[in-house]
Regions:
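Signature of the first transmembrane helix
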Residues: 5-66, 231-252
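Loop-to-helix entry region at the N-terminal start of transmembrane alpha-helices
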Residues: 2, 9-13, 43-47, 126, ...
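Small-residue-rich hydrophobic transmembrane alpha-helices
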Residues: 41-101, 138-157, 262-307
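Helix-terminus/linker motif at the lipid-water interface of multi-pass membrane proteins
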Residues: 23-42, 111-118, 174-181, 241-272, ...
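Acidic, glycine-rich loop-and-beta core segments that form the ion-binding/anion-interacting portion
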Residues: 210-241, 247-267
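Short runs within selected transmembrane alpha-helices of multi-pass transporters and secretion channels
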Residues: 62, 130-149, 157-168, 186-201, ...
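Generic alpha-helical transmembrane segments of integral inner-membrane proteins
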Residues: 15, 19, 23, 27, ...
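Short alpha-helical transmembrane segments in multi-pass integral membrane proteins
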Residues: 1-14, 69-136, 178-231, 288-307
């Protein structure tokens, strides 16, 4: 068992997948910016923290559940660990319902809080209203992928993320450039792209017969454990948005939409770098969780050092 080959097999697809996620954030801004100018690009950038919040919820819950599932499976077998998969899916459903139901009524106040006014506010609200309605696809797409990786499906995880990414590009071109649907069209393209990823992820769960059906006994204790582990990946994924929100607000105040659009280009480049680093960590996590559960602490430590 060569740890370097194992690490490469898991980490390389993960890094590529997260690189795609970084470009995913750019696609809407690229098409909207070329079609609608600074106002459209600024609106997308100001609204992005809300998109990131939903994706961070999915990432946190998915990582939390998949880590515990991998550890439990390594120590007690697949049957005993199955409850964590079911608990994770149920928590993703709860988060999706809460996000769609709660954020839909708050898109306006949130945009005002982040400094959006005038045309930027109108375009940003059009974008967020559609994004929030599709919250379930954002959350499930990012939440199921860690489960797939922890089942040894790193390449499949890359494939489903790539399918959603390509769908988003094609639909952005149609909705924004051809049909001229503006920011609402860009949001619809993003939601449909995430829907494609979600459907592919569920296909994997069913095809590989993962324990998605069964007893929910012990759900509350498992949910608490998942929430504790989920706090860290959620915070790490969402924390860069704090600086983005502050910079956007001060940019609007001091430089207007041109300043926000300028910083959006910088933020996109930073996002790709951040995603590449996160890809290394997320790619190594399934191996560390598995070896820890199997009691192979030396191997787990070696994977950690390689990462």
């Amino acid at each position: 068992m060569n740890p370097y080959k194992l690490f490469a097999a898991y980490a390389a697809p993960s890094v590529l997948a997260f690189a795609l996620s970084g470009v995913y954030a750019i696609v809407d801004g690229f098409f909207v910016g070329h079609s609608m100018g600074d106002a459209g690009l600024s609106a997308i950038n100001i609204a992005y923290p809300v998109v990131s919040l939903m994706q961070s919820l999915g990432t946190g819950i998915g990582m939390g559940g998949s880590v515990l599932w991998a550890v439990r499976r390594g120590s007690a077998g697949s049957l005993a660990a199955g409850g964590y998969v079911r608990a994770t899916l149920l928590l993703l459903l709860a988060a999706s319902t809460a996000a769609a139901g709660g954020l839909f009524w708050l898109t306006g106040p949130i945009l005002r809080l982040m400094g959006a006014e005038g045309e930027i506010f109108i375009l940003g609200k059009e974008y967020l209203d559609v994004i929030v309605l599709g919250a379930a696809f954002q959350i499930f797409a990012t939440g199921i992928v860690p489960i797939i990786r922890n089942n040894g499906g790193s390449l499949f995880a890359l494939a489903v993320m790539m399918s959603g990414f390509l769908t988003n590009i094609v639909l952005d071109y149609l909705f924004v450039w051809v049909f001229q649907w503006g920011t609402a069209g860009a949001a619809a393209a993003t939601v449909i792209g995430q829907l494609v990823t979600t459907l592919g992820a569920f296909f994997y769960l069913i095809y590989r017969r993962l324990p998605i059906m069964g007893s929910l006994s012990g759900f509350i204790p498992m949910a608490r454990q998942i929430a504790k582990v989920a706090a860290s990946p959620f915070g790490l994924t969402f924390s860069p948005m704090a600086s983005l929100m502050l910079i956007n607000r001060f940019s609007v105040t001091n430089g207007g939409e041109a300043a926000v659009a300028c910083y959006a280009c910088i933020a996109y480049a930073l996002t790709i770098v951040q995603m590449l680093v996160q890809g290394v960590g997320d790619g190594s996590q399934p191996l560390m969780s598995r070896f820890y559960g199997e009691g192979k602490l030396a191997l787990a430590s070696q994977i950690q050092r390689i990462a």
